[in-house]
Regions:
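Non-catalytic terminal and connector segments of soluble metabolic enzymes
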Residues: 1-140
Length: 140
């Protein structure tokens, strides 16, 4: 298992003022923040990042949402980082998420679900590389 994962604090959570609270959850869960950037995704960036969903019916709504305001992209480090982060954030649909997970506490629906988390070590590496140069990552 890898020791890095990628996360996004999505525009809904940033707009609601929950960035700091989610940051606290990241630290409490034992993650080291290797790098973080606050940015507003361009349409081109969002389409590139979510290209895997291009044929899905929700793609245009997803792109519109992800470009609607600032978000925070993060490279996180911890043993078994991908599975640990996914456990910390909870199910994609906040209605199905366990109590005390980020999505249960901060998300409003399946699309505006506060955070993104990589689903595999391979995708974590790709997603980190999409937003961060090697020199921007600080190991613990």
């Amino acid at each position: 298992m890898g020791n890095k994962t990628f996360a996004i604090i999505k525009p809904d959570a940033v707009k609601a003022g929950n960035t700091g609270k989610i940051y606290d959850r990241i630290i409490q869960a034992g993650f080291h923040i290797m790098s973080a950037k606050l940015l507003k995704l361009t349409e081109e960036q969002a389409k590139g990042f979510y290209a895997v969903h291009e044929e899905r019916p929700f793609f245009s709504d997803l792109i519109e949402f992800m470009t609607s305001g600032p978000c925070m992209v993060l490279a996180l480090q911890k043993d078994n980082a991908v599975s640990s982060w996914r456990e910390t954030i909870g199910a994609t649909n906040p209605e199905d998420a366990e109590d005390h997970t980020i999505r249960k506490d901060f998300a409003s629906n399946v699309q505006e679900n506060a955070v993104h988390g990589s689903d595999s070590d391979e995708n974590a590496e790709k997603e980190i590389a999409f937003f961060f140069a090697d020199g921007e990552l600080l190991s613990n």
